[in-house]
UniProtKB/Swiss-Prot annotation:
SMART domains listed in its UniProt record: WRKY
Keywords: DNA-binding, Metal-binding, Nucleus, Repeat, Transcription, Transcription regulation, Zinc
Source organism (scientific name): Arabidopsis thaliana (Mouse-ear cress)
Gene Ontology molecular function: DNA-binding transcription factor activity; metal ion binding; transcription cis-regulatory region binding
Role: Transcription factor. Interacts specifically with the W box (5'-(T)TGAC[CT]-3'), a frequently occurring elicitor-responsive cis-acting element.
GO cellular component: nucleus
Protein name: Probable WRKY transcription factor 34
Binding site for Zn(2+): C203, C208, H231, H233, C397, C402, H426, H428
Any GO BP: response to cold
Residues covered by region (Disordered): 230-252, 337-360
Gene3D superfamilies recorded: WRKY domain
Localization annotation: Nucleus
Iron is among the record's keywords: no
Location of the DNA-binding region in this protein: 172-236, 366-431
Length: 568
């Protein structure tokens, strides 16, 4: 009974009947104090109870078994004090029943072996399956701090990027920049995740819709080329391919060289004398034809050659402004400028058309720029070219479907020297005069210098207007192509500046009833030589009937002559 009294005394110490203390202390604190007091007093209670009941228990065991059991000294067995249960809801029985911390001492009914605690090797294999690596730190004796468990940064993404980067370097060798075709760059766009823009190219062959997109890696290597459309032509020969693609240097350059029909290889200036004769009637002088890079040149000195050289360089710059350097932020062509160049190339029916069609340069000396060659032209532009302070005027033929153009400029060293460059071939005949249809029907062979027919026959015969000192037209001039054995009508004379047109002759022109007498020159010539002044109306004087032909035919021819002179 002493054990029971002691337990009652201990129970008295556990519970405090004061209501004031229970109100002030929380439930968690009471539970923690209860568990600590229970464990603290368990040792003394167990010792007292064992001493009182040790003799009775030993006697009962001896009576049942028939022999006295040896005395077990338990005083030397130390009790572990490291086990501390801080939570009131967790009991020691729960720990004993857990299969993780304690092993089962019984044999397995199926294998007959003892179950063992998982080894360190098994734990290592278990943690290898976990994708996220954890950094375990030593737990301090004061308790478990949630901040002690930290996640290491995941390097798997960086590893994949490094692997892709290495793959891109290997693919750069497998993506050739030159595929055998000629390409022209027409645009680029910045893409996300890359410092180099995406480049867009299209085939330079006429009417070919093939295009490609070039992707570059972060290092500047070509990693992908996407083609759209099919080529409608075969690959050009190696000596005519001009696409340059640099791989590994970061440069993105496409240069399209000018190609000429019949020439393959370099763009060097090749000059020789054509075996085809080209006779130009210019008074007593005769011109010579030279072919330079597939271009016919008519001239009398270095002025025509300089004009042709500037014209070739200008065409090269216009046709091949698609050179773009995109390495380290160097020179790069803007979108607006590229659109303007493409629009200009479309208007002139392609950039390569001008360099492949025949080109004739005519040099003459005149005080006026607008020279009548029989065709009708419309001016569509004017600009100052490099190397010549004088502006250049651009004209194109007004006939439907005709693509012939010309540009007129004065030489840089001689202001009176006029250089006219004809590009292309006329696909039509010389139009008739605007004011009369009889002249076109009766004298079409004398009022035209057919460029198209004579170009096809390889005997180019361009109109050659004469200088101011020699007059606009003489007996052997090709401006009106008059016959030299015919004489001008009586009393007909026209002056321009201080030069007299005294050799104007018309076939069959003989005034029958009238005579034109008073077309006189101005008293003081205009310094520029561009003024044409007519005096009073022509006076009509009767003549004998045997001096001429019909009045109507002569009057029509005179009106035609006056209209021609007004146009000049």
């Amino acid at each position: 009974m002493a054990g029971i009294d002691n337990k009652a005394a201990v129970m008295g110490e556990w519970f405090d009947c004061s209501t004031t203390n229970h109100r002030k202390r929380s439930k968690a604190e009471l539970g923690r104090e209860f568990s600590l007091n229970y464990i603290k007093n368990e040792d003394s209670l167990q010792t007292t109870f064992q001493e009182s009941s040790r003799g009775a228990l030993r006697e009962r065991i001896a009576a049942r078994s028939g022999f006295n059991a040896p005395w077990l000294n338990t005083e030397d067995i130390l009790q572990s004090k490291s086990l501390t249960i801080s939570s009131p809801g967790l009991s020691p029985a729960t720990l004993l029943e857990s299969p993780v911390f304690l092993s089962n001492p019984l044999l397995s009914p199926t294998t007959g072996k003892l179950s063992s605690v998982p080894s360190d090797k098994a734990k290592a294999e278990l943690f290898d399956d976990i994708t996220t690596s954890l950094a375990f730190q030593t737990i301090s004796g004061s308790g478990l701090d949630p901040t002690n468990i930290a996640l290491e940064p995941d390097d798997s993404q960086d590893y994949e990027e490094r692997q892709l980067g290495g793959l891109g370097d290997s693919m750069a060798c497998c993506a050739p920049a030159d595929d055998g075709y000629n390409w022209r760059k027409y645009g680029q766009k910045l893409v996300k995740g890359s410092e180099y823009p995406r480049s867009y190219y299209k085939c330079t062959h006429p009417n070919c819709e093939a295009k490609k997109k070039v992707e570059r890696s972060r290092e500047g290597h070509i990693i992908e080329i996407i083609y759209t459309g099919d080529h409608i032509h075969s690959k050009p020969p190696p000596n005519r391919r001009s696409g340059i693609g640099s791989s590994g240097t970061g440069q993105d350059m496409q240069i399209d060289a000018t190609e000429y029909e019949g020439f393959a290889g370099t763009n060097e200036n090749i000059e020789w004398t054509s075996p085809v004769s080209a006779e130009l009637e210019y008074g007593s002088h005769s011109g010579s034809m030279q072919v330079q890079n597939g271009t016919h040149q008519f001239g009398y000195g270095d002025a025509a050659a300089d004009a042709l050289y500037r014209d070739e360089n200008e065409d090269d710059r216009t046709s091949h402004m698609s050179v773009s350097l995109t390495y380290d932020g160097e020179v790069e062509e803007s979108e607006s400028k590229r659109r303007k160049l493409e629009a200009y190339a479309t208007e002139t029916s392609g950039s390569t058309r001008a360099s492949r069609e025949p080109r004739v340069v005519v040099q003459t000396t005149s005080d006026i720029d607008i020279l009548d060659d029989g065709y009708r032209w419309r001016k569509y532009g004017q600009k100052v070219v490099k190397g010549n302070p004088n502006p250049r005027s651009y004209y194109k033929c007004t006939a439907n479907g005709c693509t012939v153009t010309k540009h007129v400029e004065r030489a840089s060293d001689d202001f009176k020297s006029v250089l006219t460059t004809y590009i292309g071939k006329h696909t039509h005949v010389v139009p008739a005069a605007r004011n009369s249809s009889h002249v076109g029907a009766g004298s079409s062979g004398t009022l035209q210098g057919s460029l198209a027919t004579q170009t096809h026959n390889h005997n180019v015969h361009y109109p050659m207007p004469h200088s101011r000192s020699e007059g606009l037209a003489t007996a052997n001039s090709s401006l009106f192509d008059f016959q030299s054995h015919l004489r001008h009508p009586t009393g007909f004379s026209v002056y321009i500046g201080q030069s007299e047109l005294s050799d104007l002759s018309m076939p069959g022109l003989t005034i029958g009833q009238e005579k034109l007498t008073s077309l006189q020159a101005p008293d003081i010539g205009d310094p520029t030589g561009l003024m044409l002044q007519l005096a009073a109306q022509p006076k009509v004087e009767p003549v004998s009937p045997q001096q001429g032909l019909d009045l109507s035919a002569s009057s029509l021819i005179c009106r035609e002559m006056l209209s021609r002179l007004r146009q000049i």
